[in-house]
């Protein structure tokens, strides 16, 4: 039996929600280990749609323990809203089904204000932040001035933490022309929200290790995608946390030896939200067609996603940096009806061919894609549940992807419905 880490292997929006839900039915624990409420995931269960951005996907399944690890930055007000919305939809949530790391960092209103002010004043190169305060919260964590969940339990400690935080933020706000933070108003907000958050606070590292020793199946749920990783993504157009699989251990307090299988979620084409390099991007009718057929709009922001052909170079890189054991290929059905498909197999930069994306942003922007053409198919792949249900050209497309990324397909998803999945390798039994 293997504990499984699920990571996005592109720029996010790969369809992780469905795959995590599909796996969570057999997991005992589902844990978020990085990010905040900036990356949404959509679940379709028995025809009902759930849109989550902070809570783990397992929260909608009775009898599962959902965990928000220390690697996550937590907006407590958004947490309470998301819990209330799910309860209104009939989902039962209690401290027995949801656990939050007591050392998780809080996102405060001042973080969102700072995030948005910086983005609006940055006329040189916008990062494309969602403006929800995730980046500034991580800055405070690394700067050792953050307020954490456990701080809510002691008013004297909380007041000291706020004072220390204000020294930094008031200086930043003066430079940006923003009014100073109202310290007393912030303390009042934190005191009011504390009773709604503290019942879920636990030493997650301890519980996770106890679960592991008891032989419980653990599913680690990543948000966003490896190409947005703060170290290995297309910097500076990245998120503020590590997204790759190694963060699953750091972000929950469990040792790396607990990870048995890394499942990389990969869309059958490529999308990206916001700014940054995108070598295989299509700005023509094919790109529009992919966006329309794939309904490529962000779950959280509603922003239209940029679309392009499958980039094998980038996925090969992310499979390496996350140690991916196998991929789940999603949205194959979006490619139905294309006479010809293309896969990016390399880049050209200043007359040289590259087999990887260079690290320097200016070089990334100058890379042009080298495409390989494949025959498309006219038949529908939607709802296929076995290889025999797929057109021959679709099977060839999948096999070519495996060859190029040097990683096998473990799962193939052919629609948003959780059961429309072709299982090749069971991650939990690997």
From Swiss-Prot:
The gene is purA. Its main location: cytoplasm. GO terms for biological process: 'de novo' AMP biosynthetic process; IMP metabolic process. Its EC number is 6.3.4.4. GO terms for cellular component: cytoplasm. GO terms for molecular function: adenylosuccinate synthase activity; GTP binding; magnesium ion binding. SUPFAM superfamilies: P-loop containing nucleoside triphosphate hydrolases. This is Adenylosuccinate synthetase. Keywords: Cytoplasm, GTP-binding, Ligase, Magnesium, Metal-binding, Nucleotide-binding, Purine biosynthesis. SMART domains: Adenylsucc_synt (SM00788). Homodimer.
